[in-house]
């Protein structure tokens, strides 16, 4: 069932941020001890309505700056209960620690970390409503948590160009670039390099892409830049076989079939990762997702353009 994007829109501009997020950390256990996971918090800490926005494989939590602002502003402008938006840097990315054992960069650790963060937030302020927006990897984490009987259940799940099946061709492509963090003289150089492997994100102006790239790099001691994440993320990906990928897909379908909350699948019409047939199957079993298809976009929509933001707002019952 497609979603309409008709109606007035929030007037958000990339270069006019309403406010800055608060950076915080939570300690998460792993087999070697503990690591800190960073998360970016938007909105009032007292808000009982929390939206998690979780990024893709080599991305980080600041990808959601515009969406987070739109969520907070939409509720406030409409006189609805305040919303707090939580955008984690999954371990090994952004401001989070790197794991001692790179084989830990897999979904069981990611989901466990999110459960720890969720428990910490719920202790600070009881969460009455939890929604989840997950791009690619972040969507898989969302499926894992949505299928569980958590003390704070996910009430609305948005999967951004991800489902149980992931094409083997896409995985082979990941094997070629994940871990190649590069070395760049300027942020613009890094942005240009990232664009070469990210054109499937859909049309973006040079200004929009540079804004998305600012938090994708870290500055080295010699003044140059590299991508923000641990290069060892490549270890479990390069070790993955096609047979293991097929077994993982079967397991994810079993998990998807357990999801009972309202679910929206946002799919790039040109996505090579998630086929139209797979998206159709997701409407017929398990969570029986609604589907919003974005023309001219592949994997994965950035959720920075107003039409994409409006789809999220509408599904969550917020005015666009």
Tell me the role of every PLM-derived stretch.
Residues 127-168:
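Conserved hydrolase catalytic core segment
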Residues 185-239:
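Conserved alpha/beta-hydrolase catalytic His-Asp/Glu region
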Residues 218-284:
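Conserved serine/cysteine hydrolase catalytic core
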């Amino acid at each position: 069932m497609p979603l309409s994007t008709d109606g007035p829109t929030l007037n958000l501009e990339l270069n006019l941020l309403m406010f800055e997020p608060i950076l915080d950390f939570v300690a998460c256990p792993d087999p070697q001890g503990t690591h800190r996971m960073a998360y970016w918090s938007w909105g009032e800490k007292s808000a009982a309505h929390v939206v998690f926005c979780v990024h893709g494989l080599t991305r980080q939590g600041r990808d959601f700056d515009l969406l987070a602002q739109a969520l907070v502003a939409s509720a406030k402008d409409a006189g609805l209960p305040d919303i707090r938006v939580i955008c984690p840097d999954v371990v090994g990315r952004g401001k989070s620690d790197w794991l001692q054992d790179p084989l830990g960069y897999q979904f069981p650790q990611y989901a466990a970390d999110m459960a720890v963060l969720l428990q910490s937030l719920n202790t600070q302020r009881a969460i009455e409503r939890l929604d989840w927006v997950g791009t690619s990897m972040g969507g898989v984490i969302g499926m894992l948590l949505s299928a569980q009987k958590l003390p704070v259940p996910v009430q609305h799940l948005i999967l951004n160009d991800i489902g149980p099946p992931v094409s083997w061709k896409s995985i082979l492509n990941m094997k070629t670039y994940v871990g190649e963090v590069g070395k760049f003289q300027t942020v613009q150089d890094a942005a240009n390099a990232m664009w070469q492997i990210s054109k499937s994100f859909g049309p973006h102006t040079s200004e929009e892409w540079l804004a998305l790239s600012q938090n994708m790099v870290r500055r080295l001691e010699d003044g140059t830049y590299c991508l923000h994440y641990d290069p060892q993320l490549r270890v479990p990906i390069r070790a993955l076989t096609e047979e293991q990928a097929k077994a993982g897909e079967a397991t994810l379908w079993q998990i998807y079939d357990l999801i009972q909350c309202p679910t929206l699948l946002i799919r790039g019409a040109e996505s090579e990762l998630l086929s139209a047939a797979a998206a159709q199957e997701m409407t017929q079993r398990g969570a029986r997702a609604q589907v919003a298809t974005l023309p001219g976009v592949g994997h994965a929509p950035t959720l920075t353009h107003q039409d994409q933001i409006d789809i999220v707002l509408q599904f969550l019952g917020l005015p666009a």
